[in-house]
Amino acid sequence: MHDLSHFRNNFEKLAERLATRGGAINLDGFRDLDLKRRSAISQAEQLKARKNQESLEIGKLKREGADTAERQKEVRAIADQIVALDEQVKTVDEEFQKLLSGIPNIPHESVPVGKSADDNVEVRRSGEPAKFDFEPKAHWDLGPELGILDFERAVKITGARFALYWGAGARLERALVNFFLDVHTQQHGYTEVLPPFMVNSASLYGTGQLPKFAEDLFKIENSDFWLIPTAEVPVTNIYRDETLEGEQLPVKLCAYTPCFRSEAGSYGRDVRGIIRQHQFQKVELVKFTRPEQSYDELDKLTADAEDILVRLGLPFRTVVLCTGDMGPSSAKTYDIEVWLPGQNNYKEISSCSNFEAFQARRAGIRYRTGKKSEFAHTINGSGLAVGRTWVAIIENYQQMDGSVIIPEALRPYMNAEIIRPERP
């Protein structure tokens, strides 16, 4: 959500920056509403001045003993016009808020201009992809061969885009969750929270999923409950309609949750394996900061997510998304992409974004310094997506005999050094 007065006063500049996102943005509608609102306010102010003047004249005439019935009738008519104009302004303001809620965030000036993922810019790379003495397998072949991943039974139980983990596969998923949380809480300074896995519509509006992305979500019938698409939603909304003390900032929270997505717009993409699922697990990092801190804190949060991959010895690259590839709520986003040898490409494993005050304004999240309060900036990112990290380990650490070496950092959590074939 944008600040109305800032948007109005900087319309041309902001419209130019928004145009770099591409797509249809109803800026003409904003201008038309603004003219309508200004006209109604101007007319109301003129009528109020006239009403005040008429009231003074009536008072004078009364003191002189003159008949003021007609003048009073005119004043009442003016008052009715003022009420009607005030209602018109109120209606326009509601339309403004609805229109503003559908306008994406303004891209930060450091974001490269572009139309698609092809225009994203790589900013750094860590680790070199391993060279295998054999043809590396994709996880959708390797997992079932090891007996740790079962797609057929998952389809029987539920349907497509679900997976069933067995034995060491399930333990590896659990080990990753615990490893992520331990590093972020003990090394990176985050406070762990365990939020509800369902939220209401107000929470989804606050973080920007509603109303635009309703089709990507799962709604519980006959209720206002929705399954969360990411822990970003409940964790950000912890402070909805609250004012933090300035000295508290930055507040750094992390949470493990399952996530649920309909993947309505992903038909034909990542149809094999567990890259794109209706249900998956993720550890999310969320920060609440002062505006002047937020881009430093975005860089730190991104580094915290990257650190997990470094500790696991997984090759990755980090790219800054161009204006045309960013999510609508974000002002700047870094994607961290892990190397998957079985697929011979890099795949997103974390998306780290600064929303500036966009979410905070929608959710009413403020901070106070002295007597002054203003909207906080919110930042979040995956730290990391658990299933995709599982895939990266299986594919990068596979051996010629079909076994998988467990990264050293995970061995205390797995109580093992290698995953060998199991037979469920």
UniProtKB/Swiss-Prot annotation:
Its main location: cytoplasm. GO terms for molecular function: ATP binding; serine-tRNA ligase activity. ATP binds at residues 261-263, 348-351. Keywords: Aminoacyl-tRNA synthetase, ATP-binding, Cytoplasm, Ligase, Nucleotide-binding, Protein biosynthesis. InterPro entries: aa-tRNA-synt_IIb, aa-tRNA-synth_II, aa-tRNA-synth_II/BPL/LPL, Ser-tRNA-ligase_type_1, Ser-tRNA-synth_1_N, SerRS_1_N_sf, SerRS_core, tRNA-bd_arm. It comes from the Bacteria. One of its GO terms (biological process) is selenocysteine biosynthetic process. Its EC number is 6.1.1.11. Pathway: Aminoacyl-tRNA biosynthesis; selenocysteinyl-tRNA(Sec) biosynthesis; L-seryl-tRNA(Sec) from L-serine and tRNA(Sec): step 1/1. It is found in: Cytoplasm. Pfam families: Seryl_tRNA_N, tRNA-synt_2b. Catalyzes the attachment of serine to tRNA(Ser). Is also able to aminoacylate tRNA(Sec) with serine, to form the misacylated tRNA L-seryl-tRNA(Sec), which will be further converted into selenocysteinyl-tRNA(Sec). Belongs to the class-II aminoacyl-tRNA synthetase family. Type-1 seryl-tRNA synthetase subfamily. NCBIfam families: serS (TIGR00414). Homodimer. The tRNA molecule binds across the dimer. This is Serine--tRNA ligase. It comes from Solibacter usitatus (strain Ellin6076).
